[in-house]
Regions:
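A solvent-exposed, acidic/Ser-Thr-rich amphipathic alpha-helical stretch
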Residues: 46-96, 111
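Positively charged n-region of N-terminal signal peptides that target proteins for export
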Residues: 1-5
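Short acidic-aromatic low-complexity motifs
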Residues: 27, 31-56
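Low-complexity, intrinsically disordered terminal/linker segments enriched in charged
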Residues: 134-149
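A short, surface-exposed beta-strand/turn
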Residues: 117-128
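Short beta-strand segments that buttress and anchor functional surface loops
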Residues: 102-109
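Boundary at the C-terminal end of the N-terminal hydrophobic targeting segment
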Residues: 19-27
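Bacterial N-terminal signal peptides
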Residues: 8-17
Length: 149
């Protein structure tokens, strides 16, 4: 008879631990993506950012890049060398389950009006395994006074 309360308590605690893990995963994923952005776009350490945070078999939905982390290295290495003042300023970040959405201001130089960019990352085991993105040039004469951020 004493086993039933013990079993119930054990199951409750196990369920609580699983829920806590599931709830902390989005925060962990946000931390991974934040560190990835910092290392790639602020530190300009392309190889280390990709080795640390991106799965080598990355599924890429950007129509200009093939799949794989090496394709990102082939693009961002030379690009950031040619544009050493390029920045990605994160304006907001949203995480749910295994997805992280980043809304950022991308500028090639301080004088650039920039682009509003939305990146969506899917993570597994602390690595980015899938990526989508869309971007829009920021107009010089917008139809309203609201910013894109």
């Amino acid at each position: 008879m004493k086993l039933k309360p013990f079993a119930a308590t054990f199951l409750f605690c196990a369920a609580a631990c699983l829920c806590a893990t599931a709830q902390s995963a989005p925060a962990d994923n946000k931390a991974v993506v934040t560190a990835f952005f910092r290392m790639l776009f602020q530190d300009k350490n392309v190889d280390k950012a990709l080795q640390t945070y991106v799965d080598k078999n990355l599924i890429q939905h950007d129509p200009y890049l093939p799949d794989g982390a090496s394709a990102m290295a082939d693009f961002y290495g030379p690009y950031l060398e040619q544009h050493p003042m390029a920045t990605a300023d994160i304006k907001r970040m949203i995480a749910e389950d295994d997805l992280v959405v980043v809304h950022s201001l991308w500028k090639e130089s301080p004088e650039d009006t920039g682009q509003a960019v939305v990146d969506i990352f899917r993570l597994r085991d602390g690595k980015i395994v899938e990526h989508w993105d869309v971007s829009q040039d920021i107009p010089e004469n917008p139809a309203n006074r609201n910013t894109m951020f």
